[in-house]
Each structure stands twice: as C-alpha cells, then as structure tokens.
Amino acid sequence: MNLSKTLKHVYQEAKVSDLFPVTHLNSPSIFESQSGLVGSVIKVNGAAFEIEEADTLNHQRFLLHQALVSLDSRFIIYVTTHRQKISCPLIGEFKQGFAKDLDERYQQRFQDKNLYKNTLYITVVLKGDDSSKTGSWLQWAKSLSIKGNSELSEHHREQNIQTLNRVVEQLQANLNPFGATILGKQDEALGFSELLQFLGLVVNAGQTTSFKHPVYSPPIANSIPQTFKQEAKYPEGHLGQYLSSCQLLFGECIQFQGNTQQDCLFGAMLSLKKYPTNTASILLDSMLSLDCEFIATHTFAPIGRDSALDTISKKRSKLLSAEDKALSQTTALSDLEDGIASETLLLGAHHHTVMLLAPNKSLLDAAILEATKRYGSAGIVVVKETLGQEPAFWSQLPCNQHFITRASLITSQNFVDFCPLHNTQTGFSNENFLGGAVTLLETPSKTPVYFNYHARGSKTNPSKGHAAIFGGNNAGKTTLVNFLDAQIGRFGGRSFFIDRDESSKIYILASGNSSYIKIEPSNPIAMNPLQLPDTSENRSFLKSWFATLVQEESERVIPSHIAEIINDCIDYSFEQLAPEFRTLSHLSQFLPVDFPRWPHLKRWLKRNDSRIDGEFHWLFDNQHDSLNLDFDKVGFDVTYLMDQVHSVIATPVYLYLLHRMRQCLDGRLTSFIIAEAWQLFASPFWEKALREWLPTIRKKNGHFIFDTQSPKTITDSPIKHIVLDNLATLIAFPNPLADRETYMEHLKLREAQFEAIKENTPESRIFLYKQDHEAFLCKLDLSGLSQYIRVLSANTQSVKLLDDIMQEVGHDPELWLPVFYERSKK
C-alpha cells in the first residue's frame, strides 16, 4: 500500500471526536454537547442491600423514586454502574518477624485474586423543550446567523444551565441518604477534574485517569520542569480528542488497544431485548458480584404528561378492539393513568446496555455466559450485539441518545427497580485517628471491606474502639482475633492478652519482643505489689489490693475499721521500711494480734516458725517482683483462676495485673484482648473494673476486645448497658441456635442480619462485621496459609510441641518458628 492510499485510509477512519458528543465543560460540574445539550453528573455511594430487610429496601426505593419523579420530559437520566478491579494497599509498617511475614503473604492473596469496586453515577441531561412551539422556534433560530438570534440563543443557553444547576442540586439533596456528591465540586482539593474522569470511562474501557494538561508551552524555557510547571484541569478544544487514550477497534468484539501489545482490553455489548413480567429493587443485584469489570448503563427519557396519557389511551383502545379480556392489564393501565395524571409516576423510554470487559477473549466469553445467566435468572433476555455493537457502544455516552436502538416505554417505578442504587459497602480506610484501616477482608461478592476496630471520628483524638466477637467452639474466633492483632501491629501498638487454655500462646511468642505467663501453682510467678514505687496512686491501689486479700466471699466492701488498719499498715511500710523489706510476710508482722482477718491473710503467706505455707503463698509473698510488662505483647493464661479458684482468690491477681497494665498506658495504641470473656463478665471484680474502664480508656488510646461464645454472656450481665453502649465493633460468627431477642433487641441487629447469622454454617467461615449502622458479611480467607493458622490458634498438642522445640533451640522465634512450621505439619 503506497503512502497516498495509507493517508486515504487514515482520513476515512472515524474519529472519536466525531462520535463523542460532549465537546467542552461550561464549568467544573457542567458539560455541553455539540448539539447544545447540557448535563451534570452525581456520584452516588449507593445503599447497602445484601443483609437488609424488605422494609428498608422498599424505603430506599421510595426515596429514589420521589427524587427522580420530579424530573420532566425536558431531561434524560443516565444511571451508570462502573465495576472495576482494584488494589487496596494499607498504610503502616511492621517490624521484622511473624506479623510482617503474615501480612506480606496475606496481601499477596489480594494481588492474586480479583477484587472489585462498584461506582455509581447519575447523569442528568437537559435536552430542552423540543416538543413545544417555543422549543421548535429556538431550534430554527439557532440555524440563522443573525446577531439578535445568536444573542437570544445564548440567553436561552444560560437559562438552561441555571435550570440544570438548580435541578441537579435539588436532586443531590434528595439523594443524600445514598451518599450523593456532584462531580466537579471537589476539583480544587483533588487536583483533577472528576467530571472529565467520568466522561472518559467508556472510551477508555473503564480505566480511570486523572487527566492533566499543560496550560501553555512557551517557546523558550529554562528547563522542561518549568515548561510543564503550570497545569490545567480543564483542556481547551474538543473533549473527544482529549479524553480517549486508546484505539477503538470494532469487530467480533470491541478491542481497546493501547500503545503496546500487552496494553489491550476486550469488550462486548449486551443489550436488553426482553423485559421481565415484574420488577423489584433486587432484580439486578446479582450483577454487582459478577467476576469481571463492566460498565452498565440505564437510560430513561420521560415523555410529556399529555403524550403519556395519549399512549395509555391508545393501548387501552387496542386491548378493547382486540376484545382482550385481560382484566389485570386494563386495571394496570388505569392505575398508571391515575399516577401520571396526578404526577406521581412518569412514563419514559428506557434503554439498557452493559459493556463487559476482560483482558482476553476467553475470559470475555466466560463473562458473557455468566452475565447472560444472571440476567436470565431475573427473567430478562439480553443479546450480544453484533451489527448493533457500535451504536450500542456509543449510546452509553450522555447526549448520544440518537444511537439508542432498543428503547421501550416503562414507568419510573420500573426504572428505579432496574437501577435502585444498590451497592456493596466497603467500610472506611482513613476516617479516624489511626489514618488507615486495620486490615482488608473480603465479601462473598468479591468486594473488599476495610476492617476497623475504632469508629469513625476525629483525626487527632482516639475514638471508641471496643469490640465484641461472638462465636462457638471451633468457629474461628481465636484465629480471627490473633490475625487482627497481628494486623493492627501496622500502627506500632502493644497488646495485653487475658488468655485461656494457652490458645494464643504460640502467636504471642512468635510475635517477638513478647512474654507469656501461665498463672498456676506449677508455674509460680514472683509477684510482689509492695515493691511498687512510692506514689499516691500506688499507695491508694495497694490499700484496695490488700483489702481484697482478706475479703469475705460474700463481701463487696470490707468494714471500715478493718480498712483503717490496712491503710495504716500500708502507709507504715512505705514510710518506715526499705524496699527490700516490703514483703507480704514482713508487712503482716505489723498487724495487731487480734486482726480479725488473719485466717484470710494466712493463705497468702509463706511459712514461718508459727505457720505452714499458705495455699496461695506463691502468688504475692515474694522477695522481689519479677512481673515485667515491657514488651509489645504480653499474655497471661488465667485458666487456673477461671476454673479452679473462687473469685475472691482471682480478684487480687486481676487487680494487680490491671493496675500494672494501666500504668503502661503511655499514649501508644494498646489492645486488651479478653479470651472467653463470658467467665469474666460473671465476676464482681470485672464488673466494677469494666464499668470504670470502658467509657474512659479510649482517652489513653486503649481499647478492649472481648471474645466470647454467646451474646447472652453480655446481655445477662449487670453491666450490659456499659458494655453495649461503648462497643464500636461487633463480630458475630454463624450460630444456628441464635436467639432472636438477644441478637435483635439487645445487639440491635436487623432481621436480615440476624437471619444471616442463623442460616450460614460455621464451616462457611463467614461472619457478620457491624459498626454503627453499617454491617457486612465478611470472610477471612487464609487458605494456603496453613502454617500461619497453626501459629494463630493453638491447642494442647501444638503448645506441647512448641514447648519441646523451645527446649531444643531456645526462645528466639527466629530459631524456633521454622522448626515449628515444619514439625506442626504432621
């Protein structure tokens, strides 16, 4: 082919700008087409639907219909759903070790799988009054070059822009429950044009680009950076020449060809051919979990009231002339007629396409089959466009309604059912003081969910972050709790564990810079609270602590005369005794012989000439205090305290541990993780401690995480209101025996959320994650990470294996972890 023929083919090739209707922006939020149509775009977060009951969905439908029914035949409405693959990087850094390795492997899973985000847009185009005499006259005036007519046309254009602005701002206000914002309003803060980004979606296969353009290129410049120093968000010239960044090839499928062979995507156009018998707002929800990228477009062009009534009249006449006895049809027509006459309904032309996108043709074919199947299950017939492929493609763009070939008249209620603004929710990643999410979870719809313990709040002050995790044995609670603790390490915090059955021992010790203490007689720990430094806070604590040592089982407060003796004794020990002499046995020598609680105190004392070792002497009657909390993670196994001793024995231990933990609150993010909390909620000590700590500890950047089998352990507790009112996060694993009253009345779950807990199986590993009014069905997918799971959740056998390995190679996790990974596989 010679050069002249090549040039001829180039000139004959259709330009994107010839078919791209939008030519320029009138303002950051208003675009205009070649034919003078003006439009604006509203971005919508959407409404949750996956675990919402019918009443909620119906109310959302009502709100949306009320918002749209205010538009008349001067407008065309486009609802666009853009489903796009995304990556979700998380901020924060891990120290070297187990948590860093786990995070790298876990994040790799998200890079290797398809995760999607659905973004919804409503485009409102003002096409003007093209049916009236005024509209026809203005069209005629535009064709004349008379100065007066041009001025009149310009005046009419300005009026259209004002009308559009007013209508779109009102629509945005009405759609506030759906999280609506007008594109272009935040351009200055973002540094690019949101509206241009949206307008470029279709011609760029859904690939979003933050377009920037140099204002000018001076003929002489000192350097290249100076040449491009100034940038504009809004280009000059035809937008169609500016927005397209790839070559469009139409054939068996649509090919979006970039500058390299690998930079290529394939698309297919599906169009709605046959409508379902009935519509509902859940009609096309299954498309929001389709495993491919797509752009779905619904167009609705209301017709005038008189035209609509005339159309209904003609339809009724046809039924009567055909002697069609279908009473339901004539009744429906009468209802429709009433709705249109009273302006509570609209009748309009509807058109729907979906452009499926894939990196190769085989994946595209699979997407076509799956999408067709999902439409079919909703009673809808769609066809893959062949001859009509190119018109269907260009019809997705606002102001290209002349390319629509498969429009049908439907009501505004039907239109709302086709595009109810449903969307999968993703949580938040940067809306509290941490500046990022703890981790990323996955929904059954293959959309990501940002997990946070803390509620939305100030960027400078800690928000509440207490959490309750409910699940039966083997539900996966321990694995999840420890995984989340490893992930929150990205913020450099610390954790204290009140553990049971050593279930978190392996994880804590694997984390490095950690300590794990099993509190039981066979593993005595040398604690001596009397060795605390002499401060008013410590003196006050020791007086309360000593009182618990001699408390009766049924006693909440000791008698005042006994308290006075104890207080004097504590003061004397600090004022008269050197630290090395402040032991429980030594202090007891200063108590009067007739001290009424000697029998209670002796059980805590070591032997001397006049007594044998008390049963619990190993706990506190020690020469030195070896309790060291200067670690990133500290675990206490308190199974012995939970199962084998009365609460009057456990209380002094808990009291001292919590006092020392409280003194560690230095502003670092601190997690208190309570395993099998159901046993602690029954304790008078914990009732008092939590009543005091839960409302206030956030001020020191602390939060509690309660792991328990049933919500009833909280709802039956005397402090249920303190706990529930201060919870920021709730996680519930499936429970076939879930009690409706407990979950719905006390935990404030909705019907659909409760049913999800009751109907899913524990084997599914799906759980409900709830924060405030948002709820998500999530799954922690650790498949392929079995060696990490064996660390995150321990059992008797694996703990014994760990103990044996540490005896062999030492306590450094860098030494014992590889050995544990290998041996625990067996």
PLM feature spans:
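Walker A/P-loop NTP-binding active-site region of P-loop NTPases
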Residues: 478-528
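Pre-Walker A adenine-sensing motif
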Residues: 447-460
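P-loop NTPase motor domains
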Residues: 47, 54-73, 286-289, 380-381, ...
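Glycine-rich phosphate-binding P-loop
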Residues: 460-484
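Conserved P-loop NTPase
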Residues: 750-803
